[in-house]
UniProtKB/Swiss-Prot annotation:
Transmembrane segments: none annotated. Homodimer. Catalyzes the oxidation of 5,10-methylenetetrahydrofolate to 5,10-methenyltetrahydrofolate and then the hydrolysis of 5,10-methenyltetrahydrofolate to 10-formyltetrahydrofolate. It catalyses: (6R)-5,10-methylene-5,6,7,8-tetrahydrofolate + NADP(+) = (6R)-5,10-methenyltetrahydrofolate + NADPH; (6R)-5,10-methenyltetrahydrofolate + H2O = (6R)-10-formyltetrahydrofolate + H(+). Keywords: Amino-acid biosynthesis, Histidine biosynthesis, Hydrolase, Methionine biosynthesis, Multifunctional enzyme, NADP, One-carbon metabolism, Oxidoreductase, Purine biosynthesis. NADP(+) binds at residues 166-168, 232. One of its GO terms (cellular component) is cytosol. GO terms for biological process: L-histidine biosynthetic process; methionine biosynthetic process; purine nucleotide biosynthetic process; tetrahydrofolate interconversion. Belongs to the tetrahydrofolate dehydrogenase/cyclohydrolase family. Pfam families: THF_DHG_CYH, THF_DHG_CYH_C. It comes from Pseudomonas putida (strain ATCC 47054 / DSM 6125 / CFBP 8728 / NCIMB 11950 / KT2440). It comes from the Bacteria. This is Bifunctional protein FolD 2.
Length: 284
């Protein structure tokens, strides 16, 4: 048996097309074009690439994108004042603060400074709390994108044993809440977990977001399981690989996401989806 590929690239393209169509409809109705402000501090190469992709996505769907490229020495106060200004700008529906930030800046305080109804990354404690209380508003982009990928498989998640490998605030923890909402029995594994292979082997659904190439071996995967690989790691030869050993997982899994072309495109598409939602539902 060879796994069905979950093509995040194609699903994300379809989602962007739907968003672009809705933007056209809004203009025809005389409604405001959604606006996204993207803040980049410093010159981290990976962050620059991510931000350029997000800006291109905005252009593709017809959003108004505001770019704020700030020097590495930008102060906490200056960044706070910029966020306050964008919070008060009625043309801005979403504010994205690209992480990681330079070491002298307090990311937690800055993310909390973003108004919850403009927190299109879904990182604000208010939005995480809404998700925990089963009344999600703006949902964290990567877990939200993964839920869309899972829906595309047509599989019923109710009652599934789901294992998440990685307990970060950005993916692992909110992913656990999303899967609880979907009716899964959820186990979260982390660096202190004993017998990781055993946990993975009992899972009907595995979401791996540990940032460690090849951490999950293909032979651990239960026959027919759904495997979602969030990891994206560049090897010395320049090749991008995930946290799952793809070649050996492929013949065992029922469904699997490739790296690249799986989760990454969906994270970006869900940022656009959240921005449109903010414009339509929260900033009428």
């Amino acid at each position: 048996m060879t796994a069905h590929l979950i093509d995040g690239k194609a699903i994300a393209a379809s989602l962007r097309q739907q968003i672009a169509q809705r933007v056209v409809e809004r203009r025809q109705q005389g409604l405001r074009t959604p606006g996204l402000a993207v803040i980049l501090v410093g010159t981290d190469p990976a962050s620059q690439v991510y931000v350029s992709h997000k800006r291109k996505d905005c252009e593709e769907v017809g959003f108004i994108s505001q770019a704020f490229d700030l020097p590495s020495e930008t102060t906490q106060q200056a960044l706070t004042e910029l966020i306050d200004r964008l919070n008060d700008d009625p043309a801005v529906d979403g504010i994205l603060l690209q992480l990681p930030l330079p070491a002298h800046l307090d990311a937690s305080l800055l993310l909390e400074r973003i108004r919850p109804d403009k927190d299109v990354d879904g990182f604000h404690p208010y939005n995480i709390g809404r998700l925990a209380q089963r009344i999600p508003l703006l949902r964290p982009c990567t877990p939200k994108g993964i839920m869309t990928l899972l829906e595309s498989t047509g599989q019923d998640l109710y009652g599934m044993n789901a294992v998440i490998v990685g307990a970060s605030n950005i993916v692992g923890r909110p992913m656990a809440m999303e899967l609880l909402l979907a009716g899964c029995t959820v186990t979260v594994c982390h660096r202190f977990t004993k017998d990781l292979a055993g946990h993975v082997g009992r899972a009907d659904l595995v979401v791996v977001a540990a940032g460690k190439p090849g951490l999950v071996k293909g032979e651990w995967v239960k026959e027919g399981a759904i495997v979602i690989d969030v990891g994206i790691n560049r090897q010395e030869d320049g090749k991008l690989v995930g946290d799952v050993v793809y070649e050996t997982a492929l013949p065992r899994a029922g469904w699997i996401t490739p790296v690249p072309g799986g989760v990454g495109p969906m994270t970006r598409a869900c940022l656009l989806e959240n921005t449109l939602y903010a414009a339509e539902e929260l900033h009428k």
